[in-house]
Each structure stands twice: as structure tokens, then as C-alpha cells.
């Protein structure tokens, strides 16, 4: 089975790199604000129609544009969900959502988290899914990519005060990257058997003679951007383990590739935009190393079997609990790491049913900030924060002012870097503590002991880091949990974006210094090792005590 796992990981990464490199070249053109071939005329018409000027923005104007778009989207989506029963395309006559669930869901999809405290097929109408959630899947993904575009320009421009035009970036990202790639993926999903219709739910008679209602809906179109935009919110409650969302092993592989496609392509784009492809490859190597190790650990943990099943007299040669037989243990383990390394959160197996160590790795990948490939845009700007921290640490060790790509990293940049890195750990630890201290928080726990605490820790980690996956043994649809997680999602998203944009505004005004003999090379194996060590060290120091109370304690309590 080790050979099968190694082959699966290698083939996945090989296909990913083959697809990501050409897409990275297209993204690099957009970073340079150069229209893609053949679309310049279309863009001119769009700018006139939408009233978008070509004036570039400083970091505050760029940030204000992004915040305005997202707050407007949040308000509209909340209204769509709250008054759902009065809107069209609701063949099942589903009622509107409660105010707290509508708020939680709206914040969730606007922040690219896609945490779901509801069952999609029994809660949301087709109109809410299409006009509400799918639209935000595009806009939230475009927002993350636009932020990293601004940060990359800050490194590549000199003595300037502008970072591009946010409205032009958002339109270009959506029309020329997200929409065409999502369309191709959606058509492939339809060919494989994923649903795409507006029919009412279909009553059927099962082989046993029982009556059953099969859910329908425009699934493929939402499924494509759900994966490509690292959104993760499923059309159905079972997410990508549902055969109507993910029917075959082939769609399962394509879904995993779609999750990592843009994050990997952005690494190539960063190297091209910086004028040194080695810089992008160094980040890709660091991400890939952590990813492969994490996949290997989860696969090893899951093929060991579940001792609880063994004591119950069940077959425990491998841990198949919570997994689909059409995917198996290895593919399910790979999917779990892919979806939590990226801030996607889609699942093709129930993470709550993984072994203690198998479930700890996805949780830890979220807790370190979703920087191992990460979300579209957010993964790269998160990793670049760790790059700045790594060069700062290296500067302290050798007694030189830290610099990256020729830009000196001063006190202002380090303050903003520290703030951005500390936002999500504070949310996770304080949010988990609040939940465990209150009756409203503890009453949602369906399991006692270390596993119950793990479910709470996983939920808050998922929300604060904008992942959206869950250990399912938590009744999270209550005013307390909806409000707590909505707060964590909102602050975890924009509490990082704001200091990142401040860093970009500071760096873009600086002049790049030529490299000297004392300059730290940021593209070699030494720096890759330093970067990996920085990520691991920050993650270990921050979360080992909490993990020791949850999955580690659960592992050592196994029979």
C-alpha cells in the first residue's frame, strides 16, 4: 500500500505542475496589468460600460474598494437568505433562514470560508444557491487573488505609491481566469454524471419498496467554482462524498487538482513577476515538502486501522469508517490533506471519523494559517508573511538588515507581519476557550473527552482560518455558535488582509537594492529549509498545548 500511496501523491503533483505552469504565465500578465491576448478591445468596452477608470490606487484606496465590494455582497447575501421564501426558483418552498444562520452563512461565503451550519438540500433554494452562494464563490476568490496581486506588485515596483486598480483586477480575474476554467471543469463534471438542472426533487421507489425523495439542482456549475476558488461549500450536506457532487474516482482527482491549481499557479506567477523564477519555485518547494509529509502521515495513520472497530469485532485492517468505498483510504487521505492545506474545506470523507493522528494533521494544517498552497491568493500572501518573518530571523542571526527581493524589511513591515500572523491563532485559542467556558458552547458537543474538545478546536480553527470543513460531531446551528464562528471568519479574513495591504503600501514606495555578497539568497535550499522551519516553529509553539489536550490525548487513550 506504501507504493500505491507514493504513486498517487507523485501523479497528483506531476499533473498539478503541468497544469499550473501555463496558468501561472497568464496570471503574471494580469499582475503586470497587461491584458491577455485578444481581450483588450473587450476590456475597453467593459471599462466604459462599468464606469471603471484606468487610475491606479494606493493601498488604502485598493483596500477600501475590496472592503466595499465584500460588505455590499455580505448585505445582499444576508437578505437573499433571510427572505428566501419570497424569491423565485424555490420548487420545494423552503422557508427563509433564521437571522443568526443567515448571518453566519453570508459571512462564511463572503470570506471564502464556506462553513455550513445547515444541510444544503433541505435548507436552500436554487436561487439562493445560484444568485447568492455561487456568485460569492467567484467574488471571494477574486478578492483573495487581487490582494496577492497588490502584494506582488509591491515587491516588483520601486519608488511608487500605487498598487493597481482594484476594480480592473477583480473583473480581469473573474472573467479571464475563474470563469473560463470553472466552465471547463463544470462541463467535465456534467459529462461524469454531476447534476445540473432546475427540476423539483424527484420521488422514487427504492429496491426495498420504500419511498425516497432525490434532491436535484444546478450542482455542477457550483461545484466547479467551489473547488477552483477553494471555497468548499457543498450543494448537499455530504459535500463531495455525495455521488451527485462527486460521482467517480476521476471527478475526485479533478476536484483535488482544481483546489491546488490557482495556488500553485500563483507561485509560478510570482517568480515571473519578480523577474526571477527561482523565487517562485522556492516557495513551491517549501509548500510541497510540508504537503507530502502531511499526506504521508495521514495515509499511514489511516491504513493502521481503528482500534475501536477492532474491539467491536469489525474489520479494522484499514480505517474505512466515514469513507466512500469508491475512493478508498488513500484517495480520501489525500483529499483531506489537500482540502485543509488549501483553505477549501470540501470533504469526500468525514474527518470526524479519521483516527486521532489522521484527524490532527488536517487540523494543524489549518492552524498554521493555510499557507501550504493555501486558498486562492490567501495562501501565497500568507506564505509571504512567513517569508518576511524568516528573512527577519536570518537578519538577526547574521547581524544585517533583513531584505527580500532587494526591499529592506523595516520595523513597520515587521509589526504588520506579526499582527497578520497572530490574528488567527488568537481567534482560535480565545474562541475555543470561550466555547469551553460557556454552557452555550459546551451544549453543542455530542462527544465527551478529548474528542469532544477536538471537535470544538477544529470548528474554531476552521472558521478563523477560512477553511470551512468540520468534525461533524458538533451541533453548530445555534445563536452562540453562529455568531462566534461568524466573528472568527470575518476577523480571520479581513484582519489579515488589512495588514497585508499595509505592508504592500510600505514596500511599493521603496527602492530595490542590488544584491551583494552579504545578501541572503532566498531561492536556495538553505532558505527553503529556514522557511519550512519558521512555519513549523510558529505552528508548534502556538498550538501544541491545545493539540495535546485533544487529538494527542485521544491517541494515547486508544485501546
UniProtKB/Swiss-Prot annotation:
It is found in: Cell inner membrane. The chain crosses the membrane at residues 7-27, 63-83, 132-152, 170-190, 253-273, 283-303, 327-347, 356-376, 379-399, 416-436, 484-504, 524-544. The keyword Electron transport does not apply. One of its GO terms (cellular component) is plasma membrane. InterPro entries: KdpA. Its main location: membrane. GO terms for molecular function: P-type potassium transmembrane transporter activity; potassium ion binding. It is a multi-pass membrane protein. Keywords: Cell inner membrane, Cell membrane, Ion transport, Membrane, Potassium, Potassium transport, Transmembrane, Transmembrane helix, Transport. NCBIfam families: kdpA. Part of the high-affinity ATP-driven potassium transport (or Kdp) system, which catalyzes the hydrolysis of ATP coupled with the electrogenic transport of potassium into the cytoplasm. This subunit binds the periplasmic potassium ions and delivers the ions to the membrane domain of KdpB through an intramembrane tunnel. The system is composed of three essential subunits: KdpA, KdpB and KdpC. Belongs to the KdpA family. This is Potassium-transporting ATPase potassium-binding subunit.
Amino acid at each position: 500500500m506504501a507504493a500505491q500511496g507514493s504513486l498517487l501523491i507523485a501523479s497528483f503533483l506531476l499533473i498539478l505542475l503541468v497544469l499550473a505552469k501555463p496558468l501561472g504565465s497568464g496570471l503574471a500578465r494580469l499582475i503586470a496589468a497587461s491584458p491577455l491576448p485578444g481581450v483588450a478591445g473587450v476590456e475597453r468596452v467593459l471599462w466604459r460600460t462599468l464606469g471603471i477608470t484606468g487610475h491606479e490606487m494606493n493601498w488604502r484606496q485598493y483596500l477600501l474598494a475590496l472592503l466595499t465590494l465584500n460588505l455590499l455582497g455580505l448585505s445582499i447575501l444576508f437578505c437573499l437568505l433571510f427572505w428566501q421564501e419570497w424569491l423565485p426558483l424555490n420548487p420545494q418552498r423552503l422557508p427563509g433562514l433564521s437571522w443568526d444562520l443567515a448571518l453566519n452563512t453570508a459571512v462564511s461565503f463572503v470570506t471564502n470560508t464556506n462553513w455550513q451550519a445547515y444541510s444544503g438540500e433541505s435548507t436552500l433554494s436554487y436561487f439562493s444557491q445560484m444568485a447568492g452562494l455561487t456568485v460569492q464563490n467567484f467574488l471571494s476568490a477574486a478578492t483573495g487573488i487581487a490582494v496577492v496581486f497588490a502584494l506582488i506588485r509591491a515587491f516588483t515596483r520601486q519608488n511608487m505609491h500605487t498598487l493597481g486598480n482594484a476594480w480592473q483586477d477583480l473583473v480581469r480575474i473573474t472573467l479571464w481566469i475563474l470563469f473560463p476554467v470553472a466552465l471547463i471543469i463544470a462541463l467535465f463534471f456534467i459529462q461524469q454524471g454531476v447534476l445540473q438542472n432546475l427540476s423539483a426533487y424527484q420521488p422514487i421507489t427504492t429496491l426495498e419498496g420504500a419511498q425516497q425523495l432525490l434532491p436535484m439542482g444546478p450542482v455542477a456549475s457550483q461545484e466547479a467554482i467551489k473547488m477552483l476558488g477553494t471555497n468548499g461549500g457543498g450543494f448537499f450536506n455530504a459535500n463531495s462524498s455525495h455521488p451527485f457532487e462527486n460521482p467517480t474516482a476521476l471527478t475526485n482527482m479533478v476536484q483535488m487538482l482544481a483546489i491546488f491549481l490557482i495556488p500553485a499557479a500563483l507561485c509560478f506567477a510570482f517568480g515571473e513577476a519578480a523577474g526571477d523564477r527561482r523565487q517562485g519555485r522556492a516557495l513551491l518547494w517549501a509548500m510541497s515538502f510540508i504537503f507530502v509529509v502531511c499526506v504521508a502521515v495521514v495515509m499511514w495513520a489511516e491504513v493502521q486501522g481503528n482500534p475501536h472497530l477492532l474491539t467491536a469485532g469489525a474489520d479494522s485492517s484499514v480505517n474505512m469508517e466515514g469513507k466512500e468505498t469508491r475512493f478508498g483510504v488513500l484517495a480520501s487521505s489525500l483529499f483531506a490533506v489537500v482540502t485543509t492545506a488549501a483553505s477549501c474545506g470540501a470533504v469526500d470523507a468525514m474527518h470526524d471519523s479519521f483516527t486521532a493522528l489522521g484527524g490532527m494533521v488536517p487540523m494543524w494544517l489549518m492552524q498554521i494559517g493555510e499557507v501550504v498552497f493555501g486558498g486562492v491568493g490567501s495562501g501565497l500572501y500568507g506564505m509571504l508573511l512567513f517569508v518576511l518573518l524568516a528573512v527577519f530571523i536570518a537578519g538577526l542571526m547574521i547581524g544585517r538588515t533583513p531584505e527580500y527581493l532587494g526591499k529592506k524589511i523595516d520595523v513597520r513591515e515587521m509589526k504588520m507581519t506579526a499582527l497578520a500572523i497572530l490574528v488567527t491563532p488568537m481567534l482560535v485559542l480565545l474562541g475555543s476557550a470561550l466555547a469551553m467556558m460557556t454552557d452555550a458552547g459546551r451544549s453543542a458537543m455530542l462527544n465527551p473527552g478529548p474528542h469532544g474538545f477536538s471537535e470544538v478546536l477544529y470548528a474554531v480553527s476552521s472558521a478563523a482560518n477560512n477553511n470551512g470543513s468540520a468534525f461533524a460531531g458538533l451541533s453548530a446551528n445555534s445563536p452562540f455558535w453562529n455568531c462566534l464562528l461568524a466573528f472568527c471568519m470575518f476577523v480571520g479574513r479581513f484582519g489579515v488582509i488589512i495588514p497585508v495591504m499595509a505592508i504592500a503600501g510600505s514596500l511599493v514606495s521603496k527602492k530595490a537594492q542590488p544584491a551583494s555578497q552579504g545578501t541572503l539568497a532566498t531561492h536556495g535550499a538553505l532558505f527553503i529549509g529556514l522557511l519550512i522551519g519558521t512555519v513549523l516553529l510558529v505552528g508548534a509553539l502556538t498550538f501544541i498545548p491545545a493539540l495535546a489536550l485533544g487529538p494527542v490525548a485521544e491517541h494515547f487513550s486508544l485501546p
